[in-house]
Amino acid sequence: MKLLFDLFPVILFFATFKYAEKSPELAASWMGSLLGFVPDDIKLAPILLATVVVIAATVAQIIWVHFRHGKVDKMLWVSLVLVVVFGGLTLAFQNEAFIKWKPTILYWVFAGSMIFSAFILKKNPIKAMLGEQLTLPEPVWGKVNLSWIGFFLFMGALNLFVAFNFPTDTWVNFKLFGGMGLMLVFVLGQGMLLSKYVEEEK
């Protein structure tokens, strides 16, 4: 359930785009009703409408977490800021390039924060999260942390490659299924590599 909740804005973005893609004219009409303007290029209506929805969904997600748990994770705030800024630029300039950059910036913010924590603060964020569940040698914790940094850097670059070398609908598919699929494969791979340490501990 938590995974679905975390993916809630992305799922709505995907669903809105796919629905609006079938009738750009209707999407443009909804844009006029919601924001008071119709896109200059009707072909952009699906991605612009999906951008409006993902901004609203992310705001709703923050509000729900705040009232349900009282505390909102910092990275969720970062995601909100990025989607509002890049989504707002997308709508203001009617240019989908801005919203396509958003996932990359988010991935690289994750990587940058982990680099800062590891090399400046001398703290391992992965160990801080999983240290109570796993007992690993320090060099292994370091490798796990570096692997996550590398993964986020790679995902950011891959998002740009897909976003600007393939049609928008391909990028929208990748944003949900590609990103989630690669994350799942990576996490499973990490689990397999770390399982031997869990067995040794037993």
Swiss-Prot record:
Locations listed in the record: Cell inner membrane
One GO CC term on file: plasma membrane
Pfam families named among the record's database cross-references: IspA (PF04279)
Keyword DNA-binding attached: no
Cystine pairings recorded for this chain: none
Entry keywords, A to Z: Cell inner membrane, Cell membrane, Membrane, Transmembrane, Transmembrane helix
Tree of life domain: Bacteria
InterPro entries, alphabetized: YciB
Principal subcellular localisation of the protein: membrane
Chain segments annotated as transmembrane: 47-67, 75-95, 101-121, 146-166, 174-194
Topology of this chain in the membrane: Multi-pass membrane protein
PANTHER family for this protein: INNER MEMBRANE-SPANNING PROTEIN YCIB (PTHR36917:SF1), INTRACELLULAR SEPTATION PROTEIN A-RELATED (PTHR36917)
Described purpose of this protein according to its UniProt entry: Plays a role in cell envelope biogenesis, maintenance of cell envelope integrity and membrane homeostasis.
Family: Belongs to the YciB family.
Protein name stated in the entry: Inner membrane-spanning protein YciB
